[in-house]
């Protein structure tokens, strides 16, 4: 179902950091687009084929902590395994005593010749300027990463 979201995500300027605003008609879609925005900072996720998969499960007591752990886990997969995300990501968000994300990520080993390099390397996730909120009929997920 279409909604009035302004796009999938956009970047904002921030010295030595990058502000990311990801959008979704659902919170799950916003978290998925937050992951794609992270990937597209370093390489072109549209060039990544969904050859391999990784299961990711993260939990936290609030949505901000959940977002931090989600992005941090994706950074780990790229740094430790050179796992490049394709645009195929299945995200399920659960709410109980806290929040949990169960995701199935598809991608392949990063290859600079195939996936490209934007010139930016994300070093770390931060809590700076983090915001998660519903705006009219869509969700906004905002966060800052160190580059």
Curated annotation (Swiss-Prot):
Q: Which UniProt keywords apply?
A: Calcium, Metal-binding, tRNA processing
Q: Which InterPro entries match?
A: Archease, Archease_arc, Archease_dom, Archease_dom_sf
Q: Name the chain's protein.
A: Protein archease
Q: Name one Pfam family in it.
A: Archease
Q: Which PANTHER family match?
A: ARCHEASE (PTHR12682), PROTEIN ARCHEASE (PTHR12682:SF11)
Q: Where on this chain does Ca(2+) bind?
A: 17, 146-147
Q: Where is the signal peptide?
A: none
Query: Which GO-annotated molecular functions does the record name?
Result: calcium ion binding
The alphabetized list of GO BP terms reads: tRNA splicing, via endonucleolytic cleavage and ligation
Going by the entry's taxonomy, the superkingdom of the source organism is recorded as: Archaea
Please explain the role this protein plays, according to its UniProt record: Activates the tRNA-splicing ligase complex by facilitating the enzymatic turnover of catalytic subunit RtcB. Acts by promoting the guanylylation of RtcB, a key intermediate step in tRNA ligation. Can also alter the NTP specificity of RtcB such that ATP, dGTP or ITP is used efficiently.
Which species is this record about? Pyrobaculum aerophilum (strain ATCC 51768 / DSM 7523 / JCM 9630 / CIP 104966 / NBRC 100827 / IM2)
């Amino acid at each position: 179902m279409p909604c009035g979201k302004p796009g999938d995500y956009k970047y904002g300027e921030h010295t030595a950091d990058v502000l990311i605003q990801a959008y979704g008609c659902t919170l799950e879609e916003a978290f998925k687009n937050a992951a794609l925005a992270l990937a597209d900072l370093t390489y072109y996720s549209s060039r990544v084929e969904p050859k391999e998969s990784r299961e990711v499960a993260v939990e936290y007591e609030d949505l901000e902590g959940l977002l931090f752990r989600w992005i941090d886990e994706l950074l780990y997969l790229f740094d430790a395994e050179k796992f490049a995300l394709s645009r195929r990501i299945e995200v399920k968000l659960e709410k109980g005593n806290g929040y949990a994300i169960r995701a199935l990520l598809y991608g392949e080993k990063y290859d600079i010749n195939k996936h490209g390099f934007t010139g930016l390397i994300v070093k770390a996730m931060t809590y700076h300027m983090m915001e998660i909120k519903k705006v009219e009929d869509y969700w906004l997920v905002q966060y800052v990463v160190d580059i």
